Amino acid sequence: VKLVSGDMHYPHGDPPGLTDEKDAMLICQAVPTTDLVIEARLLERAAEIEPRIMPCKVHSHEPLAHDVMRVMLKLPESQRLQFLAGQYLEFLLENGKRRAFSIANAPHDDEFIELHIRHVEGGTFTDFVFDSLKDRTVLRIEAPLGTFTLREESDRPMLFIAGGTGFAPIKGMLEHAFFSGISRPMTLYWGVRSRRDLYLPDLPEEWMAENDNFRFIPVLSEPDADWSGRTGFVHDAVLRDIGNISEYDVYMAGPPIMVTSASEAFEEHGLSRDYMFSDAFEYAAPRGK
């Protein structure tokens, strides 16, 4: 978003990959020091869903990779979470802090809330998730939040670009698109460091087998010796494949440096910012920082 007036700061330092655009800010990390006026592109449907603070219970948790945990949350029996694919929730912690995670399931599949939580060494909350979390633990959340959602009224082909656990909101978006019968061409590029970081490798392959309009292209930045697929930066792989990226709707989720680099590269190749939609997130700083 753009900061129009007021003052704020980033308590953990400027986020990596923060755009150089004048007065740009990441509202998920900024702490206001005065009243703020901001400019943001809002989606009407997302604005119509009022976020709620509610309890939830950990139904199950399982490791998907060496540093990714899938956590399934269950709301009270009488409640269901109304949300749009791609939105996120925040855990309300006892120390007053919050931790945000994207919702990985689609709205039609709402028996549980699925999260993919990456372990950050020294991060208080993720240490708790990986070392101490037990099923049936009761937590408090606020949801749904965010405007990173599908523009279903568009007729343009779609590119989905995920970095690491940025796959989570993209998963929800794609499962919603398949369920809704969207027939536009859809391509997912999933950029990770090594093969083991593709923490649900079979799922996109299943999507390809079931949907003729979907393609999946994994990209490794530090490939294994036996890797024969794509390598390098994920946005470079996209630009090598796509002849005219200006014709696409592009959805990006992952670390700010990835989203910023991709956005700048795509704009240089003719894609208007009006057709770029992103969820850039940074992992919480370790204790003491």
Identify the function of each model-found stretch:
Residues 50-138, 155-156, 192-194, 219-223:
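Ferredoxin-reductase
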Residues 1-36, 185-289:
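Reductase modules of NAD(P)H-dependent flavoproteins
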Residues 143-155:
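A short, basic/flexible loop-to-alpha-helix module at the beginning of a structural domain
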Residues 86, 166, 255:
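Short, conserved phosphate/pyrophosphate- and ester-handling motifs at nucleotide-, phospho-/glycolipid
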Residues 171-179:
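Histidine-anchored nucleotide/phosphate-binding helix
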Residues 4, 41-43, 94, 144:
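Short, surface-exposed secondary-structure boundary micro-motifs
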Residues 25-48, 137-139:
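Short, structured interface segments
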Residues 149, 169-172, 199, 261-262:
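Phosphate- and divalent-cation-binding pockets in alpha/beta enzyme and binding domains
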